[in-house]
A protein has these predicted regions:
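Bacterial N-terminal signal peptides that target proteins for export
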Residues: 1-7
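A short loop-to-beta-strand structural motif that recurs across blades of beta-propeller domains
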Residues: 67-76, 114-116, 155-158, 208-210, ...
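Beta-rich, blade/repeat-based domains predominating
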Residues: 39-51, 91-106, 112, 131-147, ...
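C-terminal motif of bacterial Sec signal peptides marking the signal peptidase cleavage site
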Residues: 16-17
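Beta-strand-rich domains and repeat architectures in extracellular enzymes and scaffolds
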Residues: 35-71
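Flexible "stalk/tail and boundary" regions
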Residues: 79, 212-215, 235-238, 251-259, ...
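Short loop/turn segments that connect beta-strands within beta-propeller blades
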Residues: 78-83, 119-123, 160-165, 212-217, ...
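A short beta-strand motif characteristic of beta-propeller blades
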Residues: 29-36, 83-90, 124-129, 171-178, ...
Length: 295
């Protein structure tokens, strides 16, 4: 993406002389808010729009220890209404699977120091270890490469090709950057091609949402709001993200409007949308909240 395009997105007030100021986002209506219980510390819900199904990464075990290499993690295949279709859909031995990204029949999921890729049709999987990573958190795929965040040590990694399922392929793993004061957690590919990152730093230090342009420059899209986790951009250009500090899922508009869509979470993690439905896992409560929106 060209720097000029990024400027128009990030600084609409400065660009007002040559472009119209974005409209204030009309609030969404939450038509229903349903809670589905019984999950084993769910960290991410991946929405497979092509096959109208969900995949939920879970830590398993008696405690939600995100760094334990205990082989207790798994991914469930779940219907849009929250009913579990297959509790352990993939047979691979995972530890603490976290962020999920889905494209076609490929599913990527992070797992402490590794990135898995699966074929959702055949269930075949392959794991690659990411040298130097401390806490592989979220993953997205853009232009044939996978990007993995590490919010513990403030790093972003690239793995290419992203589709390395075949054993004959040896993916190239690159440290894109480190120590940029982003502490990237949730990732998303924006409509303009930039890479969006939700900041999460512990102890309780607030961050916002950031955009990385094709040239690697990073800009702030929002002020410092909280400790952010899941992230997505809606078709209308507004952002959805979860915040551990406020225990909420939030919609952020082009003029800085903040709309709380749901609150009362103890561990709001990696969200996704399927049509007008928003899915938000609560890692601490072991639940998934399902919000039906008006649009």
């Amino acid at each position: 993406m060209r720097p000029k395009q990024l400027l128009l997105v990030l600084v609409p007030v400065v660009a007002a002389a040559c472009a119209s100021v974005p409209d204030v986002a009309e609030p969404l209506k939450v038509l229903s808010d349903k809670t589905v219980t019984g999950f084993g510390w769910p960290e991410s819900v991946g929405c497979d729009a092509q096959h109208n199904v969900l995949y939920v990464s879970q830590f398993g075990g008696d405690k939600p220890n995100p760094t334990a290499k205990d082989g207790l993690g798994y991914i469930s295949k779940v219907a849009p209404d929250g009913k579990v279709i297959d509790k352990r859909y993939f047979e691979a031995k995972m530890n603490k699977p976290k962020g999920i990204w889905i494209a076609g029949t490929r599913l990527w999921v992070t797992d402490i120091d590794s990135l898995w890729i699966f074929d959702t049709a055949t269930k075949q999987g392959r794991r690659v270890e990411i040298p130097g990573i401390n806490f592989a958190n979220d993953v997205i795929v853009s232009n044939g490469a996978a990007y993995v965040s590490d919010n513990r040590i403030d790093r972003l990694y690239r793995i290419e090709p992203a589709d390395y399922l075949e054993a004959s392929l040896q993916p190239r793993i690159t440290l894109v950057w480190e120590k940029r004061n982003v502490f990237p957690n949730g990732l998303w590919v924006a409509k303009d091609g930039s890479l969006l990152m939700a900041g999460f730093e512990s102890p309780e230090k607030h961050h916002g949402v950031y955009a990385m342009a094709a040239n690697g420059s990073i800009s702030e899209l929002t002020p410092d709001i909280g400790r952010l986790d899941g992230l997505a951009e809606r078709a209308d250009g507004t952002l959805l993200f979860t915040d551990w500090d406020s225990g909420a899922v939030i919609r952020y508009g082009p003029m800085g409007e903040i709309q709380v869509l749901g609150k009362g979470f103890k561990g709001p993690a990696d969200l996704c949308t399927l049509g007008k439905t928003l899915y938000v896992p609560d890692l601490v409560k072991g639940e998934i909240r399902i919000f039906e929106l008006d649009r």
